[in-house]
Structures are given as C-alpha cells and as structure tokens.
Amino acid sequence: MTRSLKKGPFVDHHLLAKVEKAVATKDKKPVKTWSRRSMVLPEFIGLTIAVHNGKQHVPVYVTDQMVGHKLGEFALTRTFKGHPADKKVKK
C-alpha cells in the first residue's frame, strides 16, 4: 500500500541532517546510513549513500530515476547462489 500524499515522504531526521551537511560542504565521501526505510529525495541526487544490508554498507550512487523509491531497494540483503546442479550418475 502506498503512503498518503498528504503525509509526504518519510526520511529519518539524522539522515536528512547528514545529507544537508554533505551538500553544504560539497563532501564526496559516502553518507553512511542504516535507514533503509527512508525515501530518496531530490536533494540526494549526485550523492553516494552507503546503505546497510545487514552485513556491510553498500555504496549507492543516487540518480534522478531513484527519487521516490526507498533506499533499501538498492541494497540487496540476500545473495542468490543458484539452484543445486543435478548430480550425474556414471554407469
């Protein structure tokens, strides 16, 4: 279910403060965050945000197509190693 338009997008306050500081100082270092639930705002475009996937921080470079999505969508939490191969029986 989508969020109500009258409520607006959700962004953690500490993440927004870090992003505003990075934009003001023109810092190019990744902004480290654990907030996967925060929505990507237009202010984030051009920044690299290191999103935690449960094990490590995955660097995500924000582009204009990402606006409106959640940060957690771009840092996968599960790795798919493939289905087990069939064992061939030698005669």
Curated annotation (Swiss-Prot):
- Give the molecular function GO annotations: rRNA binding; structural constituent of ribosome
Any GO CC annotation of this UniProt entry: cytoplasm
Q: Which domain of life is it from?
A: Bacteria
Q: Which UniProt keywords apply?
A: Ribonucleoprotein, Ribosomal protein, RNA-binding, rRNA-binding
Q: Report the SS bond pairs.
A: none
Q: Which InterPro entries match?
A: Ribosomal_uS19 (IPR002222), Ribosomal_uS19_bac-type (IPR005732), Ribosomal_uS19_CS (IPR020934), Ribosomal_uS19_SF (IPR023575)
Q: Gene3D superfamilies this protein is in?
A: 30s Ribosomal Protein S19, Chain A
Give one Pfam family, short name only.
Answer: Ribosomal_S19
NCBIfam families in UniProt: rpsS_bact
* Functional description taken from the UniProt entry: Protein S19 forms a complex with S13 that binds strongly to the 16S ribosomal RNA.
Family, according to the entry, reads as follows: Belongs to the universal ribosomal protein uS19 family.
> What name does this protein carry?
Small ribosomal subunit protein uS19
Q: Give the source lineage, highest ranks first.
A: Bacteria, Pseudomonadati, Pseudomonadota, Betaproteobacteria, Burkholderiales
